[in-house]
Amino acid sequence: MQNKGELTMNETKKLKGRDLITIGIFSALYFILNLAAMITGFVPVLWLLLPGVAGVLTGIPFMLMESKVQKPGAILIMGLITAVLYFVTGQFTVLLLITFVVACILSEAYRAITKYENHFIHMAISFILFCYGMLGSPLAIWVYKDSFLTQIQQNGMSAEYVESLSGLISVPMLIALCISPIVGGAIGALISKGLFRKHFRKAGIV
């Protein structure tokens, strides 16, 4: 039988209405900044490194959400909201869905393992894992290649763009793609820490 202290602790870990509103607001900001990262995709090499570019831009909303809602399920809900927004706007593919789900689960699991501690390194690693969710977008060019290139040309991309993109497909670029969430996510986390140093210090994040 649980004592009063355990019941109180379990109660504080539950998501409340205010938490859900906070998650919703930062999820919307994350989505908008992620779209901004996708716009940079008009430069072929930046599109192939999209997870890293997105990591640089989206560190602020994710890290702030982590600092404000240190409870189980927060990251999964953020991922779900983002996925729904992508689906509604027609940006979601099966491959992106797979990588996004896996990344959300890993990020949430890491936060659970570290007991949702207010520790910058733990929060940054969780964010980096979350950044791997966007891997599925550029990864499609390696998985589907010819059919993917044909599709984007039919969707209005110029022949020059498609040719430039095709010329970048290589094993070294694939390795760079897989590393990009680590680099971009780390930069994004450091930017958020620099901009909101006072908030992080007040929340006990070191």
Regions found by a protein language model. Give the residues of each.
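Short helix-perturbing small/polar motifs within transmembrane alpha-helices
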Residues: I32, T99-P138, A189
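Hydrophobic transmembrane alpha-helices
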Residues: N10-L76, L80
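Membrane topogenic helices and adjacent juxtamembrane segments
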Residues: Q2-M38, I152-Q153, Y161, S166-P172, ...
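Membrane-helix interface segments
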Residues: P72-L76, T93, N118-I121
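Membrane-water interface at transmembrane helix exits
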Residues: L33-M38, E66, Q70, Y86, ...
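Interfacial aromatic-anchored transmembrane helix boundaries in multi-pass membrane proteins
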Residues: I39-W47, T82-A109
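Membrane-embedded alpha-helical hairpins and interfacial helices in multi-pass inner-membrane proteins
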Residues: W47, A124-R197
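Aromatic-anchored segments of alpha-helical transmembrane domains
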Residues: S27-L35, I81-T89, L129-S137
